[in-house]
């Protein structure tokens, strides 16, 4: 008795007009996630998934490529307007935002949601180069 092959179901195309783009830019990478208003993920991409490795992941160009890829996937679901939440200290923040605008999305608001401590944990030691 052979096992019946499980069929891989393709994701159905949701028709979502507006959403939230979460741009998380660290010193080493840039991650972009586009969600609907409830927070369910529609599409995501990062500089690492675009094929950049090592120190190239932290470049603005890598962030731009990741944002374009994420925007293309979200546009397939019918998304047109975005609120952008930018977080982190990395170099890919502005270029990812510009790439989302250039992809044809209407950006309604831009929020910086970088967590700032009220003197919480001790920071890591300063780099001496």
Swiss-Prot record:
Disulfide bonds: none annotated. GO terms for cellular component: ribonucleoprotein complex; ribosome. Pfam families: Ribosomal_S11. GO terms for molecular function: rRNA binding; structural constituent of ribosome. The keyword Ribonucleoprotein applies. It comes from the Bacteria. Keywords: Ribonucleoprotein, Ribosomal protein, RNA-binding, rRNA-binding. One of its GO terms (biological process) is translation. Located on the platform of the 30S subunit, it bridges several disparate RNA helices of the 16S rRNA. Forms part of the Shine-Dalgarno cleft in the 70S ribosome. Belongs to the universal ribosomal protein uS11 family. Part of the 30S ribosomal subunit. Interacts with proteins S7 and S18. Binds to IF-3. This is Small ribosomal subunit protein uS11. The gene is rpsK.
